[in-house]
């Protein structure tokens, strides 16, 4: 519900930006093409779609944190559009998706990932997935058998369940644990 969403938003904002959130988060039942957006009016606020609040906590946190990043930069008079380097750097630092490529499949939000297969001369191979938007920030993978760098071989793009980064996952898990006390 809206009250819980605002509590969660304040928790995320405090965790990521070490400040108190001072704008409301509204639920807009008419939002269909976007999951959420930051509205920079005279009285700024964040709107989220009804279908977003029906997703799992990690998806809600990822998309809400994306909008909270817009607000944080706006509040501090910094460039806050998706294409701005300040926005890019802050979302990357915090492990938040910049702009998600998603579809809704049977009521579940799916993110687009590049699927890669990396092989080594020694016979070791591994599959990996990276968000389409952040494909240029792939880690260097090393073969655990012979310690050589693995070469990425792109297989294609697929839609699959969201895979939260470590910081986002830990933030959500901690929130859930605290809420259940």
Regions found by a protein language model. Name each.
Residues 62-75:
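Active-site recognition of the HExxH zinc-binding catalytic motif
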Residues 1-58, 75-181:
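Metalloprotease/metallohydrolase-associated module, dominated by Zn2+-dependent proteases
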């Amino acid at each position: 519900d809206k009250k819980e969403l605002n509590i969660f938003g304040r928790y995320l904002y405090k965790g990521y930006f070490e400040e108190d959130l001072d704008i409301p988060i509204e639920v807009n039942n008419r939002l269909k093409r976007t999951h959420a957006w930051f509205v920079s009016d005279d009285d700024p606020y964040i709107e989220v779609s009804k279908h977003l609040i029906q997703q799992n906590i990690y998806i809600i946190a990822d998309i809400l944190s994306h909008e909270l990043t817009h607000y944080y930069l706006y509040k501090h008079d910094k460039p806050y559009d998706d294409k701005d380097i300040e926005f890019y750097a802050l979302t990357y630092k915090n492990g938040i998706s910049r702009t998600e490529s998603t579809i809704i499949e049977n009521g579940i939000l799916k993110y687009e990932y590049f699927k890669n297969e990396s092989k080594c001369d020694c016979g070791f191979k591994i599959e990996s997935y990276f968000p389409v938007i952040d494909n240029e920030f792939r880690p260097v993978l090393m073969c655990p058998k012979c310690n050589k760098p693995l070469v990425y071989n792109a297989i294609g793009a697929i839609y699959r369940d969201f895979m939260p980064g470590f910081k986002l996952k830990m933030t959500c898990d901690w929130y859930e644990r605290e809420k259940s006390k």
